[in-house]
Amino acid sequence: PIFMTRSMRDAGGTRAVGKALQHLSLRMTDSYQRIRPLHGFALGLARYAPEITRHNAFALCFELEENNFYPQSFLQLRVKDLCLESELSERLTDR
């Protein structure tokens, strides 16, 4: 299943990654910091890194996946799409 959440913010550590810095590695929490930071990965969405690291709220669609990075295993979000909260209503009406 694909999930959607809103009002997420950078929890420190979000950055562009990949050979051409085109992907986004996220460390995020909700706007009220009620949840522990989550890790996520977004292919081709590094263009959002500057706005996210300025703590602008964002929404995302994602799948859950298990990351097996020896010796640990943890859940991470495989981000399918992402947008800033300020763009969300416009993007929803376009569909």
Predicted regions and their residues:
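Acidic, two-metal ion nucleic-acid-processing modules in DNA metabolism proteins
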Residues: 1-95
